[in-house]
Design a protein with these regions (language model features):
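NTP-dependent small-molecule kinase module
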Residues: 11, 15, 65, 90, ...
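Walker A/P-loop
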Residues: 6
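A glycine- and Lys/Arg-enriched "phosphate-lid" helix/loop adjacent to the NTP-binding pocket
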Residues: 86-131
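ATP-dependent small-molecule kinase phosphotransfer cores
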Residues: 22-85, 123
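The conserved Walker
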Residues: 1
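Short glycine-rich anion-binding loops that position phosphate/pyrophosphate groups of nucleotides
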Residues: 71-74, 97-99, 146
Length: 166
């Protein structure tokens, strides 16, 4: 949430010549309402199920490469973690500091989990999800102090090298 997955993902997809898909967009399209509305009207559990369905629909049976940006909480589900690990050749974790996440998400009304104390929530979510990110990621990019262009360059370099990158 706020690490730059969508922004970086779009640029990486363009550079690679692959389609870009954001799982939140798939959820909104299928649900016929925004992610915020899904959370508010149907609850987080329903959103997570829709998110899992979206990830599965993008990854399973795909014959051509795609750049997929998932929500930061996609890793909560062991099914998602397994699916992503099995179906994706490169899984990039954009590792951002909580301070950076607070600044980046401050202006967005589309982040229902951040209603209230955003800094405390982001710290808690980051701590809860850390082991799952480490489990799934094949590439870890530290985004601290980096521009979007530098993050994209680091991602492309890591993909080309085919190795872990920090």
């Amino acid at each position: 949430m706020g690490s730059g997955k969508t922004t970086v993902g779009k640029r990486i997809a363009q550079e690679l010549g692959y389609p870009f898909v954001d799982s939140d967009d798939v959820v909104a399209s299928v649900a016929g309402k925004s992610v915020r509305e899904v959370f508010a009207q149907d609850g987080e559990a329903r959103f997570r199920q829709c998110e899992s369905d979206a990830i599965k629909s993008v990854l399973v049976g795909r014959k051509s490469p795609v750049v997929l940006a998932t929500g930061g909480g996609a890793v909560i589900s062991s099914e998602n973690r397994s699916l992503i690990s099995e179906q994706a050749s490169n899984v990039v974790w954009l590792d951002a500091s909580v301070d950076d996440l607070v600044v980046r998400t401050k202006q967005s009304a589309a982040r229902p989990l951040l209603d209230g104390d955003a800094a405390a929530t982001l710290q808690s979510l980051s701590s809860q999800r850390l082991a799952w990110y480490e489990e799934v990621a094949t590439v870890r990019i530290d985004t601290r102090g980096k521009t979007v262009a530098k993050v994209c360059s680091a991602v492309m370099e890591a993909i080309r090298e085919g190795a872990d990158h920090e």
